[in-house]
Amino acid sequence: LRRFFDHYLKNIDNGWEQTPKVRLSVLNPGGKNIVNRVENEFPLARTKYTKLYLSAADSSLSTSLPQKETISSYQSESRQPKVTYRFRMTKSTEITGYMKLHLWVSAPDHDDMDLAIKVEKLSKDGKPFFDPTGATIAATGYMRASMRQLDTLRTTEAEPYYTYTTEQKLKPGEIVPLEIEIWPMGLMFDKDEILQLTVEAYRPAAAAIPFGSARISIPKEGYTYQPGNNVDLVTLGGNENQCADPNEVVTSPATHNAGKHCIYTGGRYDSYLYLPVIPEK
């Protein structure tokens, strides 16, 4: 970013206008990442979108719609409120761009449901990859069923947009399709590595965190500096008595999950993951 600031804040003629409009990285957990690749646009014009259909019969994903209708389910208030589906890559594959999950669901015991979606890469023997913080490397999406109404003027096949103006509660026994947006990501798979899709009940994170309990060091003079330079630091926080006004504490949001969640696949229920596959050049 230094060249950007030099050009626009200091009027330095450094050729910034010739900088490519799109540069992206494609993560390859367990392999070598592709970094700073130049592209002409995003999403990429050469994208070949592919549907992977869910099958509750064997917890799999496949390129063809299963003929048999089957159901996956879990108890949303259990310790492991989730189901997973897997697809083993038949060749080296790049997935870069916007993803979407088209999912048929019902909530027999309630009138709403909050879902969390995760798309991640597993090794050939089904083990997850972790980043330096210990978290899995994944693309995620979240959806409240009652907020499923789409903005038809803005929605595309790959990118659903919601109106957020109409609450559509679920009726007893009602099976509805959800279009769930998944954050864009660049991910490389080698042959025989596994794409795993997880659908689970979303649990809101606690929002009432004690203010001031974390200790953090920041530059004393409040400026940025080059890595490796020695600067004076000041430590803030570390005292739980330094709390915010109790009236300003944000309470944790209430969950809209209760009882069983059902996911329908096959036959009339064409639940699928919509993937942006990038052909090799």
Kindly give the residue locations of the regions a language model identified:
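Glycine/threonine-rich phosphate-binding loop and adjacent beta-strand/alpha-helix elements that clamp
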Residues: L9-K281
